[in-house]
């Protein structure tokens, strides 16, 4: 009886491991195909592959933003009314209100800053 249950357990374990391996391989293939698509869309200069980190980050961010824009279009979210001028005017109004808290008063010669507090001079 124990032999039957241990063989079933082994079979189940092998099946589970093979399923996990196949899923991880399929996800790795999707990542590689997406990277190949990005590199094909923006070919590298020469054979040196001298694409900088910032350029690669820019490519990935633009692809991410494009995906988010497509998702928003699919969900039919209304776009913000008004143009960039309205947003700029809102930002200016918020900035012109002045600081909410008064700046910290300190003695004229006291400019020392230690950790998170000003030192007493």
From Swiss-Prot:
GO-annotated cellular components: extracellular space
Stretches the record annotates as Disordered: 76-99
Superkingdom to which the source organism belongs: Eukaryota
Signal peptide: 1-24
Gene Ontology biological process terms from the UniProt entry: regulation of cell migration
Keywords: Cleavage on pair of basic residues, Disulfide bond, Hormone, Secreted, Signal
Proregion span(s): 25-105
Keyword Disulfide bond attributed: yes
InterPro entries according to UniProt: Somatostatin (IPR004250), Somatostatin/Cortistatin_C (IPR018142)
Intrachain disulfide bonds: 110-121
Family to which the UniProt record says this protein belongs: Belongs to the somatostatin family.
Protein purpose: Somatostatin inhibits the release of somatotropin.
Protein name according to UniProt: Somatostatin-1
Protein species of origin: Lophius americanus
């Amino acid at each position: 009886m124990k032999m039957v249950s241990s063989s079933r357990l082994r079979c189940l374990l092998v099946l589970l491991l093979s399923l996990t391996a196949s899923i991880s391989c399929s996800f790795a293939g999707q990542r590689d195909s997406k990277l190949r698509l990005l590199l094909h869309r923006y070919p590298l200069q020469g054979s040196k592959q001298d694409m900088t980190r910032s350029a690669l980050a820019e490519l990935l961010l633009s692809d991410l933003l494009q995906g988010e824009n497509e998702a928003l279009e699919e969900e039919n979210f209304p776009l913000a009314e008004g143009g960039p001028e309205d947003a700029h005017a809102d930002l200016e109004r918020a900035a012109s209100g002045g600081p909410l808290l008064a700046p910290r008063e300190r003695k004229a010669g006291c400019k020392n800053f230690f950790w998170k507090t000003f030192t007493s001079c």
